[in-house]
Regions:
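Repetitive, compositionally biased segments used for assembly/scaffolding
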Residues: 1-79
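Proline-enriched interdomain boundary motifs that mark the N-terminal boundary
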Residues: 79-87, 178-187
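Hydrophobic loop/turn residues within beta-sheet-rich immunoglobulin-like superfamily modules
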Residues: 88, 102, 141-142, 188, ...
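Recognizes extended acidic, P/S/T-rich segments that occur
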Residues: 110-142, 209-249
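Beta-strand-rich modules
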Residues: 142-157, 248-267
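Extracellular fibronectin type III
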Residues: 158-177, 264-284
Length: 284
């Protein structure tokens, strides 16, 4: 075994050389990477080079790393590294995932979740979180059942198009909490300083939080009335009452929204629905 090969390289029963990271060097000079990529000698007989650091340089000067990244002869990335998921956890109806480390050559990441373990082949995802900078992400308001998650890194090439790294391994998780149906505001009535709100009954709901606020905020990418600002009012409803009244509301412009809740999580704490549509009212 040549001294130029990685330390620990051994010969297998077929006469191939195998490095500790799983790179296979065949007798004809073909090098097979752990992901199955084959690098072959060129027409002139020049062979790919297996380096001490477990990288492989092909006959054109491109260097392949076992982390999935590729660089050209000038050291520029032509593919970012493969994403590696460190941990996937479930909190009520939220699925959270954390990457092991930053992918070499990456600018940002796309996270996906779906109901099929074949989703990377079919491209059928339930939700996609694109263009994320952080090494962690969360999918909120997921229904009860089995879910599959994955991630890949990307950067923009000279043409401005995304260049993707390999997909991570798929991870399977189970959500045991039941997400309530999203309520819909059907009617808002203003009479003097009183605001009456009617909304639809939500399936799998045990109650509602109805908010009237002069400020909007965002939760999990959704616009909703904020429980902050100079003026806000909150009605916490237990049961299936679908009409609430806010009295003595000060003058100004307000936003109204609500979400449903139940106690189906393992710790019996509240599991929320997505926020309803937002209605705007002006109080004189």
């Amino acid at each position: 075994i040549p001294d130029t090969y990685p330390e620990g390289t051994e010969e297998d029963k077929n006469g191939n050389l195998v490095t500790p990271e799983g790179i296979v060097i065949s007798s004809d000079g073909t090098v097979t990477l752990p992901d199955g990529t084959k690098l072959t000698p060129d027409a002139d007989g020049k062979k790919p080079t297996v380096n001490k650091d477990e990288t492989v340089t092909d006959t054109k000067g491109n260097t392949y790393s076992t982390d999935g990244s590729i660089t050209d002869s000038d050291g520029n990335y032509t593919r970012p590294a493969k994403a590696v998921i460190k941990n996937v956890s479930v909190s009520k109806n939220s699925v959270k995932m954390v990457l092991n480390e930053e992918c070499k050559g990456a600018l940002k990441y796309d996270y996906v979740i779906g109901t099929s373990e074949d989703m990377l082949k079919t491209g059928q995802y339930t939700k996609v979180l694109k263009n994320q900078e952080e090494l962690k992400s969360a999918f909120a308001y997921m229904d009860k059942g089995t879910w599959y998650v994955a991630c890949h890194a990307w950067f923009k090439g000279e043409d401005g198009k995304k260049v993707f790294g390999q997909w991570s391994e798929i991870h399977k998780v189970d959500v045991s909490a039941t997400t309530p149906q999203t309520p819909v505001i059907s009617k808002v009535t203003v009479k003097g300083s009183t605001v009456t709100v009617k909304y639809t009954k939500s399936k799998n709901s045990q109650g509602y939080d109805v908010v009237l606020s002069d400020t909007l905020t965002k939760t999990n990418g959704q616009k909703r009335p904020a429980v902050s600002g100079e003026n806000y009012y909150v009605k916490k409803i237990k049961g299936n009452t679908v009409t609430v009244t806010f009295k003595n509301v000060k003058s100004g412009t307000y936003y109204i929204g609500l979400h449903a809740w139940n106690c189906t999580s393992e710790d019996n704490s509240k599991t929320f629905s997505e926020w309803s549509n937002v209605r705007k009212v002006k109080m004189k």
